[in-house]
UniProtKB/Swiss-Prot annotation:
GO process terms (BP): proteolysis
Gene Ontology molecular function, alphabetical: cysteine-type endopeptidase activity
Keywords: Repeat, WD repeat
Keyword Hydrolase carried by entry: no
This protein's name: Uncharacterized WD repeat-containing protein all2124
Gene3D superfamilies: 3.40.50.1460, YVTN repeat-like/Quinoprotein amine dehydrogenase
Source organism, top-level taxon: Bacteria
UniProt xrefs under Pfam families: nSTAND1 (PF20703), Peptidase_C14 (PF00656), WD40 (PF00400)
WD repeat ranges per the UniProt record: 1070-1109, 1111-1150, 1153-1192, 1195-1236, 1280-1318, 1320-1359, 1361-1400, 1402-1441, 1444-1483, 1486-1525, 1528-1567, 1570-1609, 1611-1650
PROSITE patterns: WD_REPEATS_1, WD_REPEATS_2, WD_REPEATS_REGION
Record bears the keyword Translocase: no
Length: 1683
């Protein structure tokens, strides 16, 4: 902290004399010049700290004049400085002022005169009269000042070898005399007679001044927040006395331990120090007041409380008390809900916090030991070894308090205390206790009582806690083991809270008291509220009955009220006598209820196999076994009783019910049965007579809704249990948003859990609810959808599979949860690793629950601290709550889409189980229609069937074939008497029919396999193979009769997908080693390639190899066509350049001259010269006719890799291994400039056709664009993942192609924005070039191939990148300008032809919608700041801001005449504005949720609006009256637009559909389905024949008006928010959250590619050259497309 040394000028002193001032003279001396005065450690810092505390606290003095003198201040504490300061002050003070003199240092009595002197830095002990500051002098100066209050604070009784100890009688008398003379005198002395001032290193101050500072900082305030001088004295006196007393208490305990070990080196205790005051006439002087500080919470200590036995309320209360009064940041970890890894990580994390003064660890568990060692067990599966814990303690640098609460008794706790001891000056306290079995919470309660007693008093030190615990446990059977070390500082568990202000924020123990989608368990009873009345009803019924049915709707909380309400009450034994001794077990029936029952009952000692055998003996055996149990009464809870009717086989269900109901009847005194049952399953239960009778006797209905008071308890009381606060406003909003429906309770629990995750400083806030969750309605939907959409595509597919598998399809009832074995999810399509990865995400999101109980039972109780293996078949999986099935629309849609198939598939699975249980008897095989269904499933869904089901279907098919063969043989025998010719004819027909059907089934399987192969090849970038496989499938579909519609659709979709994604046009194969270079003749008809195989090959444009040039003795690195195409130049590793005649391959000449490899050759534009670049650091210029060397260009300091001529031939550019590009003048070889910027070799160069730009490719993974005129770097293109080996401009200069060692080619526009990546090469790509006057790119690779590429059939013409996320796009009326807007709040205007940015209209917050006026002069924006803005297009000036909406504005639209502007908002309204003056016209009210979209009809008479309330509303634009409301979709409606003639409306929705409506009567014409996610918007083409839709699935789809899908544009990398046609209908623009806007060419004829024959024709056109010329194409493939 900076030193304070402030003196105020005399002129300032004289001003405002009527205002009381505070004059401070503060002196502190550490270092003395006199060797006979020992130096001190803390006096200077005492002075500094007290000065700052006084300056800050004394706010009632508007003027404070501070004079500070200490070792670190600008002015030293010399006699001259201090004396001058005192005299100067007395000459300027007013009577109403206050003077405070403070001194910290040595005080000495002159032995001759008995005068008291304060020793300053230059005081000489031998000459006190002349060098010391006499106290008498100070008092005289203060007395003459005449001020109202004179304060003298002295800390001058320090130890350190001085002969004087304590305050002498002379000093006291002198101060008393001065007090008597003064009307207002107050002296504070650091100690009394015969005492001395103590300094403690851990305080960093003398103890007296330390508490002066603390008191002024707020701890000495009274109830009004004021600091009185007397109050400050009492605070300092008490705290000083207490601190020394606690220190001595700790030292006594440590010395006691030392004596016990025979150690004689004991610590001395500190004599008492009691500050003294001398006062006269001051009265109640207010010295300061508490300052309100908004500093973030800083905790003194860190605490972890681990509850490892049961969820004891006592340990939770300990955590709350530590957190609320002990300045602790406390984390409470119940072992039942925390993994071993998390507990160990938390302990390790807390030990490594250097800022903590104290770290406290409370572990409640049981000590266990075996031959393998000894550990502390927390819960069932968490084990903490002593060695591990000691290692953690050694890493801790703060004070430590470790408490081991280990009930049930153990002899080894003493060993733990002995082993965990660490000698540390910082301090360590170990406490261990073993409560007896009859009172397992005895120690925890005593510890809590000890904390509670000290919480609001003087605090609690570790030594004090030990003493109190020893006293309170003295008469019990609870042994206590302790250890205490540390001599520097008191280990304070609780600090003094007497003077602390109340905590205003909530606690954050890290415990979520809300269950989310999970049911409450018994361990959660402390947080279970709202069902107290129902719980009492259950207790009442169970008291007098042996059977109890708890019935309620799905989501009503049946399981929770039994587990967290009833069972904990029974275990307490307060309501039913002796119920605490009952044995209680809970099961779910599942698919094998008898086995589940046997496993659970086996926990009482018998093996589950023995019990299962006993159960099969019937009721008599079960009753006998129940009566033999020692616990008296056995309670069996069957949760989700309806599983007996949905999952269990009928024979098992009947036996199970017979056993349990028989036990109720014949052993009712020893057995009680409790079931939870969904209300919609009462009917099947009533069909069982005994069960129906029981239900009528004892059933309790759990109401689906709670009262508002109960809902309030559900919100508030769990939070109070863990110290959380809930804002009152939040509670009221939550209660208001409840719909009073069945699903309210689980949705509320889910929202509360989400709020807990968003908590702030231990508080649940309304702000978090509104900003993060957006309301109860839709919170679950948003959360589920968010988790699903965060998954990569492969995991999304697996998640869909999992959720469908975990849903039990309702048969006249609602769909329900379905619990299955995890192993059942693993099939060929979804292997174990994929399922495991997906389940991890879903379980972490708490959407799915994995149950390990069955597995643990199967393995037996293990003491291994490692977690159970999740891969065993005993692990079950289920959806967290059935509310998820009802409220997640995506899952609902999946279910509706797959319901029939799933039902059939599960029927087949059930038939398979029966077949296996029968020993695979043929009688259980499927036949007829059921077999046909199974066959369809087998053909199309093979990879989703388990191996056992596939075996079953295979056996069914084999049996059918066997029966067909038998039928055929019987037919032959019956026809033997018939004429031979007739017999042969009939047999022929029979054979033909059988063969036909068998062949047809095989063809279907082959088509499906080809489709799968195509998709797999696409994923692995084998595009040609993918298209060929898909073409084969399509050809087969065209030649097979009655292909199932779903197979035909899959084939069309696969072929369409392959065509849309095709990039590779042809593959030229013939080289035997990597291809390094290619060159293309100017007419584009010939391609030359140079290879590591030492050859040059010439290829025709269609891929035919027509000549190989041999002559080089080593690798050919470069080939180049002359401008006229008559000559080819080549260079390579043999250091030569060769010139060849193109027409016949004749070698014209060999040019030598380079001393190392020739890396590149290139002809001048006029063809007269050839430039060569070499590893010998040079570029050489040659005459092409004679081969003579014309010039050598030097300057590069390393090998030259590339050389190029500018288009005008006047400049030569070269790139080198020295990381530079150099430019030379061709005529004289003069070096023009050097371009620096690359970080690695420059591998390739290319001039733009206009010669103004140079592109360079480098091994630093970048391409750079340079302006030739001045050599300035224009742009760096980044995207490749490895060295870039080649770069070239297209002939029109609009595109750039680059080739890289990362196996890819990238296409960029001239602005450096990436347009496309071509992937398929299996080796690094060394060369790339454009075929002249075409959109085909050739590439050469180390994979020995040359490949020809063409951009996909549907690909963007241009990509605009400017906004951070594009929400809206719009065309100017003439199509010349495109406007984009988005998350960054800016509107950007672009030229539609070349994509250049014209201007940016800056904004603040996100813009969700934009609209041009029909005249094109204005543009309006819908803004997140609740406003609408209108801009002038020509200059970008903001003209008006329209204010009126109460929430974000989503959409704006101008009327056709441009006079009215409509805006749609999140405030549920549409507003109309006058454009000319910006005045508000009217509000259209009616929607019940936010309005996303608004549009005018073409005649301007009707306004259409789309809303989150799932409706479209039509309004009269003049009156604002509602014309019609259309219940349009099953989810949020995002947009609605009129077609050009106003006769139709198109709407889009979160239900993933586009719908077409007749506008005059609202009749639904078509529903367009195909998007896989939310559809945000749509637009009509200008001729009204097509609709474009934009979706979160990253695609734009184009539809015919009859609902036929024309094409899909799949290029975006994130959701597409907007897609609109240009006014001329020839282009389409799409704006996406991937930050880009893409401009697409739209040709309606080319786009019409979803008809099979058209697709086949397109595929054949694409493949023609490849099939005709590639040597590796098979003969059958060559016949795929006959001419």
């Amino acid at each position: 902290m900076p030193p304070i040394g402030l003196s105020t000028s005399r002129t300032t002193h004289t001003k405002q004399t009527n205002v009381p001032k505070l004059w401070l003279v503060m002196v502190g001396v550490n270092q003395y010049q006199d060797e006979y005065l020992p130096n001190l450690n803390y006096s200077a810092i005492d002075c500094q700290g007290l000065s700052e505390a006084l300056t800050e606290a004394a706010t009632q003095f508007t003027q404070k004049i501070v004079n500070v003198y200490h070792d670190f201040a600008p002015q030293p504490p010399s006699l001259t400085n201090v004396r001058h300061s005192l005299r100067d002050i007395t000459s300027h003070v007013s009577p109403i002022d206050t003077i405070l003199f403070y001194f910290s240092g040595h005080g000495v009595v002159d032995p001759t005169t008995q005068e008291v002197f304060l020793c300053l830095v230059d005081t000489q002990k031998s000459n006190l009269q002349n060098t010391g500051l006499a106290l008498q002098e100070i008092l005289q100066i203060l007395g003459k000042s005449g001020v109202q209050n004179q304060l003298v604070w002295l800390d001058a009784c320090h130890s350190g070898g001085m002969s004087l100890r304590g305050v002498t009688l002379q000093l006291v008398e002198l101060l008393q005399q001065s007090a008597a003379k003064s009307k207002g005198f107050y002296a504070l002395l650091s100690c009394d007679n015969n005492q001395q001032s103590w300094e403690f290193p851990e305080l960093g101050h003398g103890v007296f001044t330390y508490y002066l500072i603390r008191g002024l900082q707020g701890e000495a305030v009274d109830s009004q927040g004021l600091i009185y001088l007397d109050g400050l004295y009492r605070y300092v006196y008490h705290q000083t006395l207490q601190y020394i007393d606690k220190t001595n208490q700790q030292l006594r305990l440590i010395n006691q331990q030392k004596r016990g070990k025979g150690d004689t080196q004991l610590y001395n205790e500190y004599p008492l120090q009691t500050p003294k005051r001398i006062v006269e006439g001051v009265g109640e002087l207010i010295l300061g007041k508490r300052l309100e500080k908004n500093a973030p919470g800083v905790y003194r200590g860190l605490g972890i409380v681990v509850e490892g036995l049961s969820n004891s309320k006592i340990t939770l209360d300990i955590s709350k008390l530590l957190g609320s009064t002990g300045d602790f940041a406390v984390e409470y970890l119940p072992a039942t809900k925390t993994s071993s890894e998390d507990i160990k990580a938390a302990i390790a994390r807390h030990w490594q916090q250097p800022q903590a003064e104290l770290t406290l660890l409370y572990l409640r568990g049981r000590i266990e030991e075996s031959e393998a060692g000894e550990w502390l067990r927390l819960g069932e599966d968490i084990c903490i070894k002593r060695s591990w814990l000691k290692q953690q303690l050694r890493q801790c640098t703060s004070q430590q308090v470790i408490i081991l609460d280990c009930p049930l008794g153990t002899a080894s706790l003493g060993d733990w205390i002995e082993d965990l001891q660490i000698e540390s000056h910082h301090g360590q306290c170990l406490i261990a206790c073993a409560s007896p079995p009859e009172a397992p919470e005895n120690f925890a309660q005593k510890f809590l009582d000890t904390l509670t007693a000290s919480a609001q008093g003087d605090g609690l030190s570790a030594a004090g806690a030990i003493a109190q615990l020893q006293l309170s446990l003295a008469d019990s059977k609870t042994p206590l083991y302790v250890w205490l070390s540390g001599t520097q500082g008191i280990i304070e568990i609780l600090t003094n809270n007497t003077h602390k202000s109340q905590r205003t924020s909530g606690l954050d123990l890290g415990v979520c008291p809300y269950m989310g989608l999970n049911a409450f368990a018994e361990a959660d009873a402390a947080y279970f509220y709202g069902r107290e009345t129902v719980t009492q009803q259950l207790i009442h019924h169970l008291r007098d009955n042996s059977f109890l049915a708890v019935i309620g709707a799905s989501g009503s909380g049946k399981s929770s009220v039994v587990q967290a309400g009833l069972i904990p009450q029974l275990r307490q034994g307060k309501h039913i006598p002796n119920s605490e001794q009952w044995g209680i077990k809970t099961i779910r029936p599942g698919v094998n209820p008898l086995e589940a029952l046997a496993r659970k009952l086996g926990e009482w000692g018998e093996t589950h196999l023995l019990i299962e055998g006993m159960l099969h003996q019937g009721v008599e055996g079960f009753v006998y076994w129940l009566r033999s149990l020692p616990q008296g009464v056995t309670v069996l809870v069957i949760d989700q009783f309806e599983e007996l009717f949905t999952l269990a086989p009928t024979p098992d269900r009947e036996l199970f019910l017979e056993l349990l109901l028989g036990a109720v009847q014949y052993a009712g005194d020893r057995f009680k049965l409790i079931i939870t049952l969904r209300a919609d399953f009462i009917a099947p239960c009533l069909e069982v007579p005994a069960l129906a009778e029981a239900l009528q006797v004892a059933s309790v209905l759990v109401p689906p809704k709670l009262s508002l008071d109960d809902y309030r308890r559900v919100i508030l009381h769990p939070a109070q249990q863990v110290g959380l606060q809930v804002e009152a406003e939040l509670v009221e909003v939550l209660l208001r948003e409840l719909n009073q429906s069945v699903g309210d309770l689980p949705l509320l629990e889910f929202v509360l859990e989400q709020l807990w995750q968003q908590r702030t400083a231990g508080k649940l806030t309304l702000q978090s609810y509104q900003e993060q969750l957006g309301g109860i309605k839709g919170a679950l939907e948003r959360s589920c959808q968010g988790v699903y959409e965060s998954l990569p595509p492969q995991l999304q597919e697996c998640a869909k599979w999992i959720f469908l598998s975990l849903t039990q399809l309702g048969e006249g009832t609602e769909d329900t949860r379905r619990r299955i074995y995890k192993s059942d999810l693993i099939v060929k399509k979804y292997p174990a690793g994929l399922v495991e990865q997906t389940l991890n995400v879903l379980t972490n999101a708490k959407l799915v629950v994995i149950n390990l109980e069955a597995e643990i039972e199967a393995q037996g109780k293990s003491f291994s601290p490692t977690p159970p293996n999740l891969s065993t078949p005993f692990v079950t999986v289920e959806v967290a709550h059935e509310i998820l099935i009802r409220h997640w629309s995506t899952l609902r849609w999946w279910l509706e889409e797959n319901r029939d198939r799933l039902r059939k598939q599960r029927q087949i699975n059930h038939a398979c189980q029966l077949w296996q249980q029968s020993g695979k008897q043929a009688d259980f095989l499927l036949q007829g229609a059921r077999l046909a269904e199974a066959e369809d499933i087998y053909i199309y869904w093979t990879d989703e069937l388990g191996a056992d089901v596939q075996e079953f279907i295979g056996a069914c098919l084999a049996e059918r074939k066997h029966q067909q063969l038998q039928a055929k043989n019987r037919l032959k025998q019956a026809q033997r008497a018939v004429v031979a010719l007739s017999v042969l004819g009939i047999a022929s027909v029979s054979f033909g029919g059988l063969a036909y059907w068998q062949g047809r089934e095989a063809q279907f399987r082959e088509i499906a396999a080809l489709n799968s192969s195509s998709q797999a090849n696409l994923l692995s970038h084998q595009q040609l193979a993918a298209l060929i496989a898909s073409l084969k499938a399509a050809q087969q579909v065209n030649h097979v009769i009655a292909v199932p519609n779903n197979l035909k659709l899959a084939t069309v979709t696969t072929l369409q997908q392959a065509l849309f994604e095709m990039q590779e046009r042809n593959r030229l194969e013939g080289h035997k080693d990597g291809v390094i270079s290619i060159s293309i003749s100017r007419d584009g008809q010939t391609i030359a390639s140079g290879s590591l195989d030492k050859t040059i090959k010439l290829w025709s444009r269609d891929g035919r190899l027509f000549r190989t040039l041999n002559g080089h003795e080593d690798a050919v690195y470069s080939v180049s066509f002359s401008p006229d195409g008559q000559t080819i130049a080549s260079g390579g590793s043999d250091k030569t350049i060769k010139l060849w005649q193109t027409s016949d391959g004749t070698l014209l000449k060999t040019i030598t001259g380079h001393e190392q490899t020739v890396n590149n050759v290139y002809f001048s534009p006029d063809g007269k010269n050839l430039a060569s670049a070499s590893s010998d650091h040079s570029i050489k210029l040659w005459d092409t006719t004679s081969g003579q060397l014309l010039m050598t260009l030097t300057g590069h300091s390393a090998g030259v890799i590339t050389v190029r001529f500018s288009p005008d031939g006047q400049t030569i550019a070269a790139g080198s291994e020295d990381k530079t590009v150099k430019l030379w003048h061709r005529q004289d070889g003069k070096l023009l400039k050097t371009l620096n910027g690359h970080q690695d070799w420059v591998n390739s160069l290319s001039f733009s056709p206009d010669g103004k730009t140079l592109a360079s490719a480098s091994a630093d993974k970048t391409i750079k664009l340079w302006r030739i005129a001045d050599g300035k770097l224009v742009k760096t293109l980044k995207g490749h993942n490895d060295s870039v080996w080649d770069v070239n401009f297209s002939s029109d200069g609009k595109a750039i192609a680059s080739a890289s060692r990362d196996n890819t080619i990238k296409l960029w526009n001239r602005h450096g924005i990436e347009l496309e990546t071509f992937t398929g090469h299996s080796g690094g790509v060394y060369a790339v070039n454009f075929l002249p006057d075409s959109n085909i790119i050739a590439s050469a690779s180390l994979d020995n191939t040359i490949r020809l590429w063409q951009r996909p059939l549907i690909s963007p013409l241009e990509v605009l990148a400017g906004n951070s996320g594009v929400y809206a796009v719009s065309f100017l009326h003439d199509g010349s300008i495109i406007a984009t807007a988005g998350a960054d709040g800016n509107i950007q205007l672009w030229h539609s032809q070349d994509g250049s940015l014209l201007k940016t209209l800056p904004g603040n917050k996100a813009i969700y919608g934009i609209s041009f006026t029909p005249q094109g002069d204005l543009i309006a924006s819908a803004n997140a700041d609740k406003t609408v803005k209108i801009w002038r297009v020509r200059d970008g000036k903001a003209l008006k801001t329209l204010i009126g909406h109460d929430n974000e504005v989503n959409k704006v639209n101008f009327s056709p005449d441009g006079k009215t502007l409509a805006s749609a908002s999140r405030d549920n309204t549409v507003k109309l504005w006058n454009v000319s003056d910006g005045k508000f016209k009217k509000t259209l009210k009616g929607h019940t949720d936010e309005v996303f979209w608004v549009s005018f009809s073409p005649d301007g008479k009707i306004i259409a609006s789309a809303s989150a309330d799932k409706t479209i509303r039509l309004w009269d634009s003049f009156s604002g009256n509602l014309i019609k409301s259309l219940p349009a979709h099953n989810d949020l409606v995002y947009s609605v637009n009129f077609n050009p003639d106003g006769s139709m409306l198109a709407s889009t929705s979160a239900d993933k559909t586009v719908k077409l409506w007749r506008s005059h009567d609202g009749h639904l014409l078509h529903t367009f389905s195909g998007h896989s996610n939310v559809v945000y918007s749509s637009s009509f083409s200008p001729d009204g024949r097509y609709i474009a839709s934009a979706s979160e699935d990253k695609t734009v789809k184009i539809w015919q008006i009859d609902g036929h899908l024309l094409t899909t544009l799949p290029q975006h990398q994130a959701g597409v928010m907007s897609a609109i046609f240009s006014p001329d209908g020839k282009t389409l623009i799409s704006g996406s959250l991937d930050t880009t806007t893409k401009i697409w060419r739209f040709d309606s004829q080319q786009a019409k590619t979803s008809q099979m024959n058209t697709l086949v024709m397109s595929a054949c056109n694409w493949l023609q050259d490849y099939l005709n010329t590639n040597p590796n194409v098979t003969p059958n493939e060559q016949k795929l497309c006959p001419s």
